[in-house]
Amino acid sequence: MQFLNMFFFDIYPYIAGAVFLIGSWLRYDYGQYTWRAASSQMLDRKGMNLASNLFHIGILGIFVGHFFGMLTPHWMYEAWLPIEVKQKMAMFAGGASGVLCLIGGVLLLKRRLFSPRVRATTTGADILILSLLVIQCALGLLTIPFSAQHMDGSEMMKLVGWAQSVVTFHGGASQHLDGVAFIFRLHLVLGMTLFLLFPFSRLIHIWSVPVEYLTRKYQLVRARH
């Protein structure tokens, strides 16, 4: 048990991270034709907008919340944001984003499996990744009742300590998870596994998000007379 704990929370994060970065780079260099979202909207528009919007809004909220919530050093906000308040914000905002993502993910998965035209262009990797994302989202929602048992933020700070130890390459990161509920550990392992699978799936299109679109100049479109 001690070996598994050390492997999954001291070693596995770096395996997943290395595959995530190196795999993405190699795919960009050698597989640019596959570097796409492979949208299926033209094949079946029914319910696509609702499902896609719910899923993407939810997952964006989850990503932003996890990124800043887990990786922001405590000293940067302790003077104006008590840990108990941060815990409540994480539970409510994360819960709302999780519900949106879960509903959208289930609708997208249903469409992938039961729409004949979409199913014909769907790969096993598509179904696997979307299924894992739905499961991961459900696991995240299931952690909320466990978080509610530690409203002082102690459980959350253990997870924060682990994440910050990993990204700053401090040894013994797994020690921060002593006493943490199994549901959190499962959530962490599946999350790292998604990073491991990232370069081999259509998730790769996230790297090409058109951020510059937000700041580009307006385009003038003139009618021909």
UniProtKB/Swiss-Prot annotation:
Residues bound to heme b 2: 66, 187
GO cellular component annotations of the record: membrane; NarGHI complex; nitrate reductase complex; plasma membrane
Residue ranges annotated as Cytoplasmic topological domain: 30-47, 113-124, 199-225
Gene Ontology biological-process entries: anaerobic electron transport chain; anaerobic respiration; nitrate assimilation; nitrate metabolic process
Cross-referenced InterPro entries: Heme-iron_electron_transfer (IPR051936), NarG-like_domain (IPR023234), NarG-like_sf (IPR036197), Nitrate_red_gam (IPR003816)
Binding locations of heme b 1: 56, 205
Any one GO molecular-function label of the UniProt entry: electron transfer activity
Modified residues (N-formylmethionine): 1
Pfam (any one): Nitrate_red_gam
Cofactor: heme
Membrane topology, as annotated: Multi-pass membrane protein
Subcellular localization: Cell inner membrane
RNA-binding among keywords: no
Residue spans crossing the bilayer: 4-29, 48-70, 83-112, 125-148, 183-198
Keywords: Cell inner membrane, Cell membrane, Electron transport, Formylation, Heme, Iron, Membrane, Metal-binding, Nitrate assimilation, Oxidoreductase, Transmembrane, Transmembrane helix, Transport
Name used for this protein in its record: Respiratory nitrate reductase 1 gamma chain
Organism placement in taxonomy: Bacteria, Pseudomonadati, Pseudomonadota, Gammaproteobacteria, Enterobacterales
Gene that this sequence comes from: narI
